[in-house]
Amino acid sequence: MPSQDYKDTLNLADTPFAMRANLAKREPDWLAAWEADDVYGKIRQARAGATKYILHDGPPYANGQIHLGHAVNKVLKDIIVKSKTLSGFDAPYVPGWDCHGLPIEQKVEAKHGKVGQKVSATEFRGLCREYARTQIELQKADFKRLGVFGDWDNPYLTMNFHQEANIVRALAKIYDNGHVTRGMKPVNWCLDCSSALAEAEVEYQDKVSDAIYVSFDIVDSGKVAALAEIDGNIAAVIWTTTPWTLPANQAIALHSEHNYSVVATENGNLLLATDLVESALSEFKLENKGVLATVLGRELEGLHAQHPLIEARQVPLILGDHVTTDSGTGLVHTAPGHGLDDYIVGLKYNLPVENPVSGTGVYLESAAVFAGEHIYKANPQIIAALHENGHLIRHTKIEHSYPHCWRHKSPIIFRATPQWFISMETKGLRERALADIPTVQWTPAWGQNRIESMMTGRPDWCISRQRTWGVPITFFTHKETGELHPNTLELMETAAQRIHEGGVEAWFDASCEDFLGAEAADYDKATDTLDVWFDSGTTHFAVLDQRDELTNPADMYLEGSDQHRGWFQTSLLTSEAMYERPPFKQVLTHGFVVDENGRKMSKSLGNIITPQEEINKTGADMLRLWIASSDYRYEMSAGKTVFKGSIDMYRRIRNTLRFLLANTDDFDPATNSVDINELVSLDKFIIERAQTVQAQIISAYDAMDFHQVTQHITAFCSQDLGSFYLDIIKDRQYTTQTDGQPRRSAQTAIYHIVQALIRWITPILSFTAQEAWEVLHGADSYVFTEEWYTFPEFELSAISNDDWQRIMLAKDMVNKHIETARGEKIINANLSADVNLYADGAMHESLAKLGEELRFVLITSNATLKPLSTVPAHSASTDEQTDSNSTGVVDLVVEVHAATGTKCVRCWHIRDDIGTDSTHPELCARCATNVSGDGEVRHYA
């Protein structure tokens, strides 16, 4: 036991910044305080007049609680907005919601019944509005709990009256620019929805279907010389997986340049693509009894075949470029009312666009066969009828990828109905969009190829829906001609004004007479609603153009990778149709969340992780850190192991912050700062290192490489600070005089670093950043209004950056030798070691600059530097280490042995100068002067 207690002479660090974050419990209180103090408003005030940066929120659908994918999306947006704010931009964030459409209708129907049965259409729309509002409030609470800042009190809602009105105005502008067309055209149709579907509402799943080969007897083969001499009937064979579409067949398509052969079989003479004869006959289990003729497809154009189910119908053989010989027979069953390729080729030949199927899948009374029967029940009846009349060549089952409704997960059909379209070709919309896609920055870069391929192949956009809850297509069509009213634009503006005052109900509840007066008898008022993708796709006009704090085009659209076929595409098309330019400067996409085995999360697998449960366990900051540290460009893995990695990363950052804050607890930068040029060399070096890291972090934020941001931060905390700088300065912080130059120099450096570090983590660890900020600046100050830290200007002088790189290299080698010596029981701690370093050249020069302070860098009681030539013969062999600042190899020998002397009871260094000050017989000379003298001075470490 020391005779005197020196504890009170040490600078023991303390801070209110707790070791345990307790985020899950404390974050709600912070949120409540921030909301009460209008932090978002303070940020707007702080950036008033600055250059704008607009991230436009893609609206989530107002239905159900948020899932982990929602959390990823909103947090990524928040990181960008907060980082741009730190970069000096005025970056307002206006969240939005998509409020119309079928899922909400279904929820209301389940509770209140269908329109016309238990509720009127007007009542139904009111119930839909109310349901959407309740869902928005639930989701809003979850988004705010994530620490996402935004104008939550004034979000945009596609069901706001003024926004519904502006959606109508957007349609009017697109109509005025000549992009809206009407026609009987096959569209994606869900029998469960009883409505058309947008491309984005269709997903592909495997399905088992009936596959049949059917023969059509050619009735006028004699018109082709090569076929005229063939004895017996010739039958063209088609293949289809949708037998129910055969009643709508209007033609058989062939390719003009493919060869077709008439093959004799025990089932008669069959016409097949020459390249498919063998595979087809093998499938039919028929023998090739000889090829009777071979002709080019174009020679068969204009022949007719008897429909196998409808006696009164003969169908032509036509030519189409869509016909291939990859499989089947090379002859394609063509029903323009049930397929887009069929429809397109049908236009060329003026084929009827017959649709004998109702919206619920029942054959209409006008159908030539099977009237009143549901198409799926008719399938086996059609197959049986073909078998009975001898036209069924083969019937099998196949599993194939088939389009399904994304809501009902049920197979869709293609069905021609009168619909409104935005044409891709009439005014060159496709061409214009493709020309502008390369002008946008796509992140990741492959997003450009993806949307280009989708834009190249997409059909006209069917914008009409047969729903109750949606924005109306405010058209009036003439009862006889089908033409739109000549004053359509004026009528649409009138409708928009009324909707602005009373919502979409102002259209639906009004009569034709309310708009047209005496003309009403000649016109039909449209009852269709707009595709909800039109609602969200026109927010560049209905939101960005209408709010003073926003700008159009936006700087950034950010959504999941599925939105190349959804919101990105519909926004691009509507903007091109309205303004002839994209609505965004940059588009960023993120991957989906999967479990740790790479599986999609689903109830059936029992692997769903909700953001709510994770936040309740560890807090929103931990979830935000997982999101930021994941490479969002790919699938994002979530689970216990992955989350543990984020927890460990968080602890490293928090512990570093705690050390920095504790060691500046008594530091007043106004009175205690050391002039930047008078700092200890090590302190200058770590500030310069922090400047370098800050530049890397800001660059990574600007590039949206948030996982790189987290790596830079954690590497700086663990390597530059934890393993090097903070370890070295502990002695200086604790043992030198409280107000002495060595300690205040370190505190000055720490102050600059913690100011920067808090800002670095603010976009990601928002709660923790503000908690740390308040320790420095009080509860009335917010880091969210700050900009990136500006470090003081200075130059390294006595010891250069290259010197420090070599010194760190030597320190690493010393640490390895000390660990070996500890393992061999030569020493039991760093301070029980003396080290000799034998070096030459640049390494010797760099180490020599530290002089007597070398031991403080190495954290040993003594350190002696000697020329390499003096290394004892018994010493360890030379260690070779590559000098990172040169191309050569550095020779350095490290020798570790037990320190000789007496242990100082205050600093624990083992020295031979213990008791040289008689007033303090148990202290080393350094501690004695720090306790009762002038205090030590440090120059280098």
Curated annotation (Swiss-Prot):
Biological processes annotated in GO: isoleucyl-tRNA aminoacylation
Name a Pfam family for this protein. tRNA-synt_1
Q: Bound how, and how many: what does the cofactor note say?
A: Binds 1 zinc ion per subunit.
Query: What residues bind L-isoleucyl-5'-AMP, as annotated?
Result: E559
**What Gene3D superfamilies does this protein's entry cite?**
1.10.730.20, HUPs
Named cofactor requirement(s): Zn(2+)
User: For binding ATP, which residues are annotated in this chain's numbering?
Assistant: K603
**Residue numbers covered by motif 'HIGH' region:** 60-70
Keyword list (alphabetical) reads: Aminoacyl-tRNA synthetase, ATP-binding, Cytoplasm, Ligase, Metal-binding, Nucleotide-binding, Protein biosynthesis, Zinc
Give the residues the record marks as binding Zn(2+).
C904, C907, C924, C927
Q: Record's SUPFAM superfamilies?
A: Anticodon-binding domain of a subclass of class I aminoacyl-tRNA synthetases, Nucleotidylyl transferase, ValRS/IleRS/LeuRS editing domain
Q: What is its EC number?
A: 6.1.1.5
The record's catalysed reaction(s) read: tRNA(Ile) + L-isoleucine + ATP = L-isoleucyl-tRNA(Ile) + AMP + diphosphate
Q: Name one GO cellular component term.
A: cytosol
- Signal peptide segment: none
What does the entry note on its domains?
IleRS has two distinct active sites: one for aminoacylation and one for editing. The misactivated valine is translocated from the active site to the editing site, which sterically excludes the correctly activated isoleucine. The single editing site contains two valyl binding pockets, one specific for each substrate (Val-AMP or Val-tRNA(Ile)).
Q: How does it assemble?
A: Monomer.
**NCBIfam families this protein is in?**
ileS (TIGR00392)
Entry protein name: Isoleucine--tRNA ligase
